[in-house]
Swiss-Prot record:
Keywords: NAD, Oxidoreductase. This is Inositol 2-dehydrogenase 4. Its EC number is 1.1.1.18. It comes from Saccharopolyspora erythraea (strain ATCC 11635 / DSM 40517 / JCM 4748 / NBRC 13426 / NCIMB 8594 / NRRL 2338). It comes from the Bacteria. Homotetramer. InterPro entries: Gfo-Idh-MocA_inositol_DH (IPR050424), Gfo/Idh/MocA-like_OxRdtase_N (IPR000683), GFO_IDH_MocA-like_dom (IPR055170), MI/DCI_dehydrogenase (IPR023794), NAD(P)-bd_dom_sf (IPR036291). GO terms for molecular function: inositol 2-dehydrogenase (NAD+) activity; nucleotide binding. Belongs to the Gfo/Idh/MocA family. It catalyses: myo-inositol + NAD(+) = scyllo-inosose + NADH + H(+). Involved in the oxidation of myo-inositol (MI) to 2-keto-myo-inositol (2KMI or 2-inosose). The lineage of its organism: Bacteria, Bacillati, Actinomycetota, Actinomycetes, Pseudonocardiales.
Length: 338
Protein backbone atom coordinates (compact mmCIF):
# COMPACT_ATOMS: atom_id res chain seq x y z
CA UNK A 1 0.00 0.00 0.00
CA UNK A 2 2.78 2.51 0.83
CA UNK A 3 3.78 2.86 -2.85
CA UNK A 4 0.39 3.67 -4.26
CA UNK A 5 -2.09 6.50 -3.72
CA UNK A 6 -4.39 6.31 -0.72
CA UNK A 7 -7.98 6.07 -2.03
CA UNK A 8 -10.02 8.20 0.38
CA UNK A 9 -13.77 8.13 1.01
CA UNK A 10 -15.31 11.25 2.55
CA UNK A 11 -18.36 10.95 4.77
CA UNK A 12 -20.18 14.24 5.41
CA UNK A 13 -19.98 16.97 2.77
CA UNK A 14 -20.99 20.08 4.75
CA UNK A 15 -18.77 23.03 5.64
CA UNK A 16 -15.79 21.02 6.92
CA UNK A 17 -16.24 18.01 4.61
CA UNK A 18 -16.32 20.10 1.43
CA UNK A 19 -13.21 21.96 2.60
CA UNK A 20 -11.44 18.62 3.15
CA UNK A 21 -12.63 17.38 -0.29
CA UNK A 22 -10.85 20.31 -1.97
CA UNK A 23 -7.82 19.73 0.24
CA UNK A 24 -7.54 16.02 -0.67
CA UNK A 25 -8.11 16.71 -4.36
CA UNK A 26 -5.89 19.77 -4.77
CA UNK A 27 -3.55 20.41 -1.87
CA UNK A 28 -2.11 17.16 -0.57
CA UNK A 29 -0.08 14.47 -2.31
CA UNK A 30 -0.30 10.68 -2.32
CA UNK A 31 -4.08 10.58 -1.84
CA UNK A 32 -7.14 10.86 -4.07
CA UNK A 33 -10.83 11.28 -3.32
CA UNK A 34 -12.74 8.28 -4.70
CA UNK A 35 -16.13 8.53 -2.92
CA UNK A 36 -18.29 11.06 -1.08
CA UNK A 37 -21.26 10.10 1.08
CA UNK A 38 -23.89 12.45 2.49
CA UNK A 39 -27.65 11.95 2.99
CA UNK A 40 -27.94 15.32 1.25
CA UNK A 41 -27.25 14.23 -2.36
CA UNK A 42 -26.71 17.77 -3.64
CA UNK A 43 -23.96 18.39 -1.10
CA UNK A 44 -22.27 15.11 -1.94
CA UNK A 45 -22.44 15.92 -5.65
CA UNK A 46 -21.05 19.42 -5.11
CA UNK A 47 -18.08 18.06 -3.13
CA UNK A 48 -17.36 15.43 -5.81
CA UNK A 49 -17.86 17.79 -8.77
CA UNK A 50 -14.90 17.87 -11.12
CA UNK A 51 -13.13 14.93 -9.47
CA UNK A 52 -12.85 12.21 -12.10
CA UNK A 53 -14.24 8.83 -11.02
CA UNK A 54 -15.40 10.06 -7.60
CA UNK A 55 -18.57 8.14 -6.71
CA UNK A 56 -21.44 9.71 -4.77
CA UNK A 57 -23.60 7.96 -2.14
CA UNK A 58 -26.45 9.00 0.13
CA UNK A 59 -25.75 6.08 2.48
CA UNK A 60 -22.50 6.82 4.38
CA UNK A 61 -21.97 3.11 5.15
CA UNK A 62 -21.65 2.40 1.42
CA UNK A 63 -18.58 4.66 1.36
CA UNK A 64 -17.00 3.01 4.40
CA UNK A 65 -17.69 -0.44 2.99
CA UNK A 66 -16.66 0.24 -0.64
CA UNK A 67 -13.88 -2.14 -1.65
CA UNK A 68 -11.92 0.59 -3.45
CA UNK A 69 -11.86 2.87 -0.37
CA UNK A 70 -8.60 2.47 1.62
CA UNK A 71 -9.31 5.11 4.28
CA UNK A 72 -12.08 7.43 5.41
CA UNK A 73 -12.38 11.10 6.42
CA UNK A 74 -15.38 11.56 8.70
CA UNK A 75 -16.87 15.07 8.72
CA UNK A 76 -20.43 14.56 9.96
CA UNK A 77 -21.80 16.12 13.17
CA UNK A 78 -20.23 14.68 16.35
CA UNK A 79 -23.43 12.91 17.46
CA UNK A 80 -23.30 10.71 14.32
CA UNK A 81 -19.64 9.63 14.68
CA UNK A 82 -19.88 6.48 16.84
CA UNK A 83 -21.59 4.02 14.40
CA UNK A 84 -19.51 5.30 11.48
CA UNK A 85 -16.26 4.92 13.45
CA UNK A 86 -17.26 1.42 14.55
CA UNK A 87 -17.96 0.47 10.91
CA UNK A 88 -14.50 1.71 9.81
CA UNK A 89 -12.79 -0.13 12.68
CA UNK A 90 -14.77 -3.28 11.82
CA UNK A 91 -13.49 -3.02 8.24
CA UNK A 92 -9.97 -2.37 9.51
CA UNK A 93 -9.40 0.88 7.58
CA UNK A 94 -7.83 4.13 8.87
CA UNK A 95 -10.22 6.97 9.65
CA UNK A 96 -9.56 10.66 10.24
CA UNK A 97 -12.51 11.70 12.41
CA UNK A 98 -13.29 15.38 12.79
CA UNK A 99 -13.48 16.47 16.43
CA UNK A 100 -15.15 15.61 18.73
CA UNK A 101 -14.49 11.85 18.68
CA UNK A 102 -18.03 11.60 20.09
CA UNK A 103 -19.92 14.06 22.32
CA UNK A 104 -19.83 11.96 25.54
CA UNK A 105 -17.35 9.73 27.30
CA UNK A 106 -19.35 6.46 27.26
CA UNK A 107 -19.61 6.40 23.45
CA UNK A 108 -15.97 7.52 23.12
CA UNK A 109 -14.95 4.65 25.36
CA UNK A 110 -16.87 2.21 23.15
CA UNK A 111 -14.80 3.43 20.18
CA UNK A 112 -11.56 2.98 22.17
CA UNK A 113 -12.66 -0.52 23.20
CA UNK A 114 -13.41 -1.46 19.57
CA UNK A 115 -9.96 -0.25 18.54
CA UNK A 116 -8.29 -2.11 21.40
CA UNK A 117 -10.15 -5.27 20.31
CA UNK A 118 -8.93 -4.71 16.74
CA UNK A 119 -5.41 -4.48 18.17
CA UNK A 120 -4.23 -1.45 16.18
CA UNK A 121 -4.68 2.30 16.06
CA UNK A 122 -6.93 3.15 13.13
CA UNK A 123 -8.61 6.33 14.37
CA UNK A 124 -7.05 9.79 14.29
CA UNK A 125 -9.05 12.70 15.74
CA UNK A 126 -9.02 16.00 13.83
CA UNK A 127 -7.57 18.20 16.55
CA UNK A 128 -5.90 20.42 13.93
CA UNK A 129 -4.35 22.91 16.35
CA UNK A 130 -1.63 20.29 16.94
CA UNK A 131 -0.52 21.02 13.33
CA UNK A 132 -0.69 24.83 13.55
CA UNK A 133 2.84 26.30 13.28
CA UNK A 134 2.23 28.71 16.21
CA UNK A 135 0.85 26.01 18.53
CA UNK A 136 3.66 23.64 17.52
CA UNK A 137 6.20 26.35 18.41
CA UNK A 138 4.48 26.95 21.76
CA UNK A 139 4.73 23.24 22.54
CA UNK A 140 8.43 23.15 21.59
CA UNK A 141 9.08 26.26 23.71
CA UNK A 142 7.32 24.85 26.78
CA UNK A 143 9.15 21.54 26.45
CA UNK A 144 12.56 23.16 25.89
CA UNK A 145 12.23 24.45 29.47
CA UNK A 146 13.74 27.95 29.10
CA UNK A 147 10.52 29.51 30.43
CA UNK A 148 10.42 27.25 33.47
CA UNK A 149 7.40 25.27 34.65
CA UNK A 150 4.00 26.32 33.28
CA UNK A 151 1.72 27.67 36.06
CA UNK A 152 -1.28 29.09 34.21
CA UNK A 153 -2.67 29.31 30.69
CA UNK A 154 -5.18 31.91 29.50
CA UNK A 155 -7.15 30.99 26.39
CA UNK A 156 -9.73 32.89 24.33
CA UNK A 157 -11.86 31.02 21.79
CA UNK A 158 -14.20 33.29 19.85
CA UNK A 159 -16.49 32.53 16.90
CA UNK A 160 -18.30 35.29 14.96
CA UNK A 161 -21.63 33.46 15.32
CA UNK A 162 -22.84 29.99 16.21
CA UNK A 163 -24.70 28.00 13.52
CA UNK A 164 -28.45 27.34 13.98
CA UNK A 165 -29.12 24.58 16.51
CA UNK A 166 -25.87 25.20 18.41
CA UNK A 167 -26.53 24.62 22.14
CA UNK A 168 -24.92 25.69 25.39
CA UNK A 169 -23.60 22.13 25.84
CA UNK A 170 -22.02 22.33 22.37
CA UNK A 171 -19.99 25.33 23.58
CA UNK A 172 -18.21 22.69 25.67
CA UNK A 173 -18.14 19.48 23.59
CA UNK A 174 -17.90 21.08 20.15
CA UNK A 175 -15.82 24.20 20.95
CA UNK A 176 -13.91 23.96 24.27
CA UNK A 177 -13.05 20.36 23.30
CA UNK A 178 -10.19 22.02 21.36
CA UNK A 179 -8.83 23.61 24.56
CA UNK A 180 -9.19 20.31 26.44
CA UNK A 181 -7.03 18.69 23.77
CA UNK A 182 -4.47 21.51 23.53
CA UNK A 183 -4.15 21.57 27.34
CA UNK A 184 -3.38 17.83 27.46
CA UNK A 185 -1.09 18.04 24.43
CA UNK A 186 0.83 21.17 25.43
CA UNK A 187 1.30 20.20 29.07
CA UNK A 188 1.55 16.42 28.62
CA UNK A 189 -0.76 15.63 31.53
CA UNK A 190 -4.39 14.80 32.25
CA UNK A 191 -7.21 17.16 33.16
CA UNK A 192 -8.58 16.52 36.64
CA UNK A 193 -11.48 18.97 37.10
CA UNK A 194 -13.55 21.57 35.26
CA UNK A 195 -15.59 24.58 36.47
CA UNK A 196 -17.80 26.92 34.43
CA UNK A 197 -18.99 30.45 35.26
CA UNK A 198 -21.48 32.59 33.38
CA UNK A 199 -20.92 36.33 33.06
CA UNK A 200 -23.64 38.66 31.76
CA UNK A 201 -24.68 37.31 28.34
CA UNK A 202 -24.52 39.00 24.94
CA UNK A 203 -27.94 39.93 23.59
CA UNK A 204 -26.88 38.02 20.43
CA UNK A 205 -27.09 34.63 22.19
CA UNK A 206 -30.11 32.52 21.15
CA UNK A 207 -32.61 31.73 23.89
CA UNK A 208 -31.43 29.00 26.26
CA UNK A 209 -27.76 29.90 25.79
CA UNK A 210 -25.62 32.22 27.90
CA UNK A 211 -22.67 33.44 25.90
CA UNK A 212 -19.76 33.95 26.69
CA UNK A 213 -18.84 31.41 29.38
CA UNK A 214 -15.66 31.15 31.45
CA UNK A 215 -14.27 27.64 31.83
CA UNK A 216 -11.51 26.80 34.31
CA UNK A 217 -9.52 23.62 33.73
CA UNK A 218 -7.34 22.01 36.43
CA UNK A 219 -4.54 19.61 35.52
CA UNK A 220 -2.91 16.78 37.45
CA UNK A 221 0.17 18.86 38.40
CA UNK A 222 -1.94 21.88 39.45
CA UNK A 223 -1.78 24.10 36.34
CA UNK A 224 -4.92 26.26 35.99
CA UNK A 225 -6.21 27.04 32.49
CA UNK A 226 -8.87 29.67 31.87
CA UNK A 227 -10.91 29.53 28.65
CA UNK A 228 -13.21 32.29 27.50
CA UNK A 229 -15.61 30.63 25.07
CA UNK A 230 -17.63 33.21 23.15
CA UNK A 231 -19.47 31.75 20.15
CA UNK A 232 -21.44 34.86 19.10
CA UNK A 233 -18.73 37.51 19.48
CA UNK A 234 -19.85 39.16 16.26
CA UNK A 235 -16.52 40.32 14.85
CA UNK A 236 -14.75 37.16 13.56
CA UNK A 237 -12.76 34.08 14.53
CA UNK A 238 -10.10 34.41 17.21
CA UNK A 239 -8.17 31.70 19.05
CA UNK A 240 -5.50 32.72 21.56
CA UNK A 241 -3.43 31.02 24.21
CA UNK A 242 -0.93 32.50 26.66
CA UNK A 243 1.17 30.23 28.85
CA UNK A 244 2.42 31.82 32.08
CA UNK A 245 5.52 30.04 33.36
CA UNK A 246 7.94 30.50 36.26
CA UNK A 247 10.46 32.33 34.07
CA UNK A 248 8.33 34.07 31.43
CA UNK A 249 5.28 33.88 29.20
CA UNK A 250 4.59 32.69 25.65
CA UNK A 251 1.54 33.65 23.63
CA UNK A 252 0.06 32.44 20.31
CA UNK A 253 -2.90 33.66 18.25
CA UNK A 254 -2.11 37.36 18.60
CA UNK A 255 -2.84 39.72 15.75
CA UNK A 256 -0.33 39.36 12.96
CA UNK A 257 -0.21 39.71 9.20
CA UNK A 258 -0.50 42.82 7.12
CA UNK A 259 -1.66 46.13 8.61
CA UNK A 260 -2.98 48.99 6.49
CA UNK A 261 -3.18 52.75 7.02
CA UNK A 262 -6.16 54.14 5.14
CA UNK A 263 -8.83 56.85 5.51
CA UNK A 264 -7.39 58.13 8.79
CA UNK A 265 -7.24 54.69 10.42
CA UNK A 266 -4.77 51.80 10.67
CA UNK A 267 -5.27 48.09 11.27
CA UNK A 268 -5.45 44.55 9.96
CA UNK A 269 -8.21 42.01 9.46
CA UNK A 270 -9.73 39.21 11.55
CA UNK A 271 -10.37 35.76 9.98
CA UNK A 272 -14.12 35.19 9.46
CA UNK A 273 -13.95 31.53 10.57
CA UNK A 274 -11.69 28.53 11.26
CA UNK A 275 -10.95 27.81 7.59
CA UNK A 276 -8.54 30.66 6.80
CA UNK A 277 -7.18 30.81 10.37
CA UNK A 278 -6.22 27.13 10.41
CA UNK A 279 -5.81 26.38 6.68
CA UNK A 280 -2.11 25.56 7.04
CA UNK A 281 -2.85 23.35 10.05
CA UNK A 282 -5.62 21.45 8.18
CA UNK A 283 -3.33 20.94 5.15
CA UNK A 284 -0.52 19.62 7.34
CA UNK A 285 -2.95 17.43 9.31
CA UNK A 286 -4.42 15.79 6.18
CA UNK A 287 -1.00 15.31 4.55
CA UNK A 288 0.50 13.67 7.63
CA UNK A 289 -2.60 11.55 8.20
CA UNK A 290 -2.53 10.28 4.57
CA UNK A 291 1.22 9.55 4.78
CA UNK A 292 0.74 7.68 8.06
CA UNK A 293 -2.32 5.79 6.76
CA UNK A 294 -0.31 4.56 3.73
CA UNK A 295 2.33 3.31 6.16
CA UNK A 296 -0.34 1.64 8.35
CA UNK A 297 -0.47 4.08 11.29
CA UNK A 298 -1.74 7.46 12.51
CA UNK A 299 0.11 10.76 13.08
CA UNK A 300 -1.93 12.95 15.41
CA UNK A 301 -4.46 12.72 18.23
CA UNK A 302 -5.52 9.12 18.91
CA UNK A 303 -8.90 7.68 19.86
CA UNK A 304 -7.60 7.73 23.44
CA UNK A 305 -6.93 11.49 23.16
CA UNK A 306 -10.48 11.91 21.85
CA UNK A 307 -11.81 9.84 24.75
CA UNK A 308 -9.86 11.82 27.38
CA UNK A 309 -11.16 15.07 25.84
CA UNK A 310 -14.72 13.64 25.93
CA UNK A 311 -14.34 12.86 29.66
CA UNK A 312 -13.30 16.48 30.28
CA UNK A 313 -16.26 17.67 28.16
CA UNK A 314 -18.65 15.58 30.22
CA UNK A 315 -17.35 17.22 33.43
CA UNK A 316 -17.66 20.62 31.71
CA UNK A 317 -21.27 20.04 30.67
CA UNK A 318 -22.16 18.94 34.23
CA UNK A 319 -20.35 22.00 35.65
CA UNK A 320 -22.29 24.32 33.32
CA UNK A 321 -25.56 23.56 35.09
CA UNK A 322 -24.41 22.70 38.63
CA UNK A 323 -22.02 25.64 38.95
CA UNK A 324 -19.77 23.30 40.91
CA UNK A 325 -16.15 22.30 40.36
CA UNK A 326 -16.56 18.90 38.68
CA UNK A 327 -13.88 16.18 38.78
CA UNK A 328 -13.12 14.39 35.51
CA UNK A 329 -13.81 10.64 35.53
CA UNK A 330 -11.30 8.95 33.26
CA UNK A 331 -10.67 5.21 33.00
CA UNK A 332 -7.14 3.85 32.95
CA UNK A 333 -5.35 4.30 29.63
CA UNK A 334 -5.29 0.99 27.69
CA UNK A 335 -1.86 -0.38 26.78
CA UNK A 336 -2.49 0.20 23.05
CA UNK A 337 -2.02 3.93 23.71
CA UNK A 338 1.10 3.74 25.89
N1 LIG B 1 -11.60 21.19 13.26
C1 LIG B 1 -12.41 22.24 13.15
O1 LIG B 1 -12.04 23.38 13.40
C2 LIG B 1 -13.81 22.02 12.68
C3 LIG B 1 -14.52 23.06 12.11
C4 LIG B 1 -15.84 22.83 11.73
C5 LIG B 1 -16.41 21.60 11.92
N2 LIG B 1 -15.66 20.62 12.49
C6 LIG B 1 -16.26 19.31 12.72
O2 LIG B 1 -16.58 18.73 11.47
C7 LIG B 1 -17.77 17.96 11.59
C8 LIG B 1 -18.81 18.50 10.60
O3 LIG B 1 -19.08 19.84 10.89
P1 LIG B 1 -19.64 20.85 9.78
O4 LIG B 1 -19.48 22.21 10.33
O5 LIG B 1 -19.05 20.55 8.46
O6 LIG B 1 -21.18 20.45 9.78
P2 LIG B 1 -22.24 20.66 8.59
O7 LIG B 1 -23.56 20.64 9.25
O8 LIG B 1 -21.85 21.83 7.74
O9 LIG B 1 -22.07 19.36 7.71
C9 LIG B 1 -22.36 18.08 8.19
C10 LIG B 1 -22.74 17.20 6.99
O10 LIG B 1 -22.91 15.88 7.47
C11 LIG B 1 -24.07 15.34 6.83
N3 LIG B 1 -24.58 14.27 7.69
C12 LIG B 1 -25.35 14.33 8.77
N4 LIG B 1 -25.53 13.11 9.30
C13 LIG B 1 -24.85 12.24 8.52
C14 LIG B 1 -24.63 10.85 8.56
N5 LIG B 1 -25.13 10.07 9.53
N6 LIG B 1 -23.87 10.33 7.59
C15 LIG B 1 -23.33 11.07 6.62
N7 LIG B 1 -23.49 12.41 6.55
C16 LIG B 1 -24.24 12.98 7.50
C17 LIG B 1 -25.02 16.50 6.67
O11 LIG B 1 -25.97 16.27 5.65
C18 LIG B 1 -24.05 17.63 6.32
O12 LIG B 1 -23.85 17.74 4.93
C19 LIG B 1 -18.20 18.07 13.06
O13 LIG B 1 -17.66 16.98 13.76
C20 LIG B 1 -17.55 19.36 13.51
O14 LIG B 1 -17.29 19.42 14.89
C21 LIG B 1 -14.40 20.79 12.84
O1 LIG C 1 -16.90 23.01 14.97
C1 LIG C 1 -16.32 24.28 15.18
C2 LIG C 1 -14.82 24.18 15.01
O2 LIG C 1 -14.29 23.16 15.79
C3 LIG C 1 -14.12 25.49 15.30
O3 LIG C 1 -12.70 25.33 15.23
C4 LIG C 1 -14.50 26.02 16.67
O4 LIG C 1 -13.92 27.30 16.84
C5 LIG C 1 -16.00 26.13 16.82
O5 LIG C 1 -16.31 26.63 18.10
C6 LIG C 1 -16.68 24.78 16.58
O6 LIG C 1 -18.08 24.92 16.69
Amino acid sequence: MSNRELRVGLVGAGLMGSDHATRIHRRISGASLVAVGDPDLERAERAAAGIEGCQVETDPLKVIEASDVDAVVLATPGRTHEPLLLAAIERGIPVLCEKPLTPDSKSSLRVVEAEVAAGRRLVQVGFMRRFDPEYAELKRTLHAGALGRPLLMHCAHRNASAPPGFTSQMMIFDSVVHEFDTTRWLLGEEITAVSVRHPRSTANAPSGMTDPQLVTIETASGVLVTVEIFVNCGFGYQVRCEAVCEGGTAQVGGDSGMTTHVRGAWGGSVAPDFRPRFQQAFDEELQRWADAARAGGIDGASAWDGCAAAAACEAGVAAQTSGARTPVQLVERPGLYA
